[in-house]
Structures are given as structure tokens and as C-alpha cells.
Amino acid sequence: MKKSMFLLMVLLFCMTSVSAQYQNATEEQKKDIIGKITQASGDMKTMKCDFVQVKELSFMDDKVTFEGIMYYKKEDKIRWEYTKPLKSVFSMDGKNVYLKSGDSNASVMPVKSNKMFSELSKVLIGGVSGNGLVDSPDFDTQFMVGKDDYKIVLAPKKKEVKDLFSSVQLFVSKSDSRILSVELIEKSGDKTTISLKNTQMNIAIDDNLFSEK
């Protein structure tokens, strides 16, 4: 009996500790958060940063970790350049999606010809810049406030996005309204966490970088 009571108390403590990390935002806080992210996104013309991407599979305990460099240029250009453990590139120049593995030639697919790529580009670009995502009518959005950051949970409404993700979670710095990390939760329960670091803003980035050959 005592053991059962002890376990119950531990469980309740853990649940309280987790929930205490973030509190639901008030309506006034929501407006303030959206305003700050929109302002920060508007001020950001380009971005370059290192990233660490961790893939957690629902049916395995092991995690798969990738590292690389991400480039973004307003409005619709993004490049994920993976450097570890394997070299590959996923990039978009606003018109096409480019996929390249190792030294092979890139595969090219028009964004508009594929609804999935079109929606994916919005999620990826919005996920790293905040641009057009936090206030999008295409998502049911929940805002939460933590000690040093905001947590924004977006549940997609469109089928094309639902087929990819059950939710997108953004973690945003309170100090400068910059996206710190993105969590992509798939329908299968698999989770991908992308953490951004060593961020450089508004630097010169050549357009050719987004058109992989």
C-alpha cells in the first residue's frame, strides 16, 4: 500500500513538473507573441545557421542524428545541407525542389506540380522563420508560455499536411522572437526535432545556392 502511494505521488509530481514548464497563453499574450514573431520575421531577409536533426522512431529506442547547415532567403528559398553522417542536400528555390545525395546529380521536381511539396515548403520555411505559420488559418494553434521561450503547437487542417504531420511544434526565444527548434510529429508517432544554432541574420547569400545541380 505504501509503495503504491509512493509511486502515485512520484507520478503526480512528474506530471506537475512537466505541466509547470509551460502555461497556456492568455489572449493578450497570444496577440503579443504573434506580433513579435511577425516583426522578427519581417526584419529577417536571410538566415544561415547550423542545425542538429534528431529522428525518433516510434518502434525503436534508438535515435538517428544528422547535422548540417541551413540557409534561408526571403520569401521562399531554403536549403538543408546535411554534412553528417552522410552528405545530402534538400533545397527549394521557390519554383523547384532539389534532392541530391552525395556526388550524384540532383533530382528536380516543380513545387506547384505536387501539393505535398507545396505544403511542405510552407511548413519548413515557416518553421525556421515564423513567416506565415503562427497565424495561418490552415492550422489550429495553441500558444504556451515558458520561462525563457514560447511553445506553439500547430495542428494541420489540410489533408496534404495531415498526411505528413499530426502536429508541428515551434519553440521560440522570448529574448529575440527567434525560432530555437522545431518538432515535427508524424501520424505514425515518429518525431523529428530540428535545433538551430550559431545563427547569422541578414547576411549575403547567393540565389544559386538554392538551385542544386
Features from the language model and the residues they span:
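Sec-dependent N-terminal signal peptides
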Residues: S4-C14
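Sec/Tat signal peptide C-region and signal peptidase I cleavage site
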Residues: T16-Q21
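Flexible, processing/modification-adjacent segments and terminal tails
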Residues: Y22-T26, T38-D43, K55, K63, ...
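An acidic-aromatic
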Residues: Q23, I69-S118, T192
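A short, Trp-centered hydrophobic/proline-enriched beta-strand micro-motif
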Residues: S41-M60, Y71
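Extended beta-sheet lipid-handling architectures
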Residues: C49-V52, E67-G68, S167, L196
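Short hydrophobic/aromatic-rich beta-strand segments that constitute the beta-sheet cores
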Residues: F51, I78-Y82, V97-K100, I152-L154, ...
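Gly/Pro-enriched, hydrophobic low-complexity segments
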Residues: G132-K213
